[in-house]
Design a protein with these regions (language model features):
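Conserved nucleotide-sugar donor-binding subdomain of glycosyltransferases
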Residues: 77-134
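N-terminal subdomain of nucleotide-sugar transferases
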Residues: 1-79
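Short His-centered aromatic/hydrophobic patch
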Residues: 138-141
Length: 141
């Protein structure tokens, strides 16, 4: 019997140092005959021994894609530090906006995701290549 392929969608990268990554690593650790891929929508680098494949989509990549359609809206991430992180200036702006929690920032983020071309050929190829049996998205509140 072939391994069960599970595709998990998340906001944050699957990192054992954050609550999502720690919880899901504990849930899936030690289960034989599964393969897991993770599509995540934030900056950062995954860090765990469970997931085999990653795909990252960020607001920044969506905005770049809206400005220039040849710029990819997402990319497959390999553990060798291939994920997109913010530079120091961008990180300060991002943290400030997150702390202030202005409603306009939520609207702007929703707008970018609404008009953004997130369903890209790269994302479709990633999903087609992985061929998931189950797609799972945790509900965050």
């Amino acid at each position: 019997m072939s391994a069960l392929r599970i595709l998990i969608l998340s906001n944050t990268p699957w990192d054992n140092s954050n609550s999502f990554g720690n919880s899901f690593s504990n849930i899936f650790f030690g289960i034989d005959d599964i393969e897991i891929a993770n599509i995540y929508c934030r900056y950062g680098e995954p860090d765990n021994c469970i997931v085999k494949k990653y795909f990252q989509i960020t607001e920044k990549s969506l905005i770049k894609n809206l400005k220039n359609s040849s710029s990819p809206s997402g990319k497959e991430v390999f553990i060798e530090a291939d994920s997109t992180d913010l530079n120091e200036k961008e990180q300060i702006a991002f943290d400030s906006a997150r702390k202030k929690r202005w409603q306009i920032m939520f609207w702007a983020r929703d707008f970018v995701w609404k008009i953004g071309r997130w369903c890209s050929p790269e994302l479709k190829a990633f999903i087609d290549d992985f061929k998931p049996d189950v797609i799972f998205q945790p509900i965050y509140y």
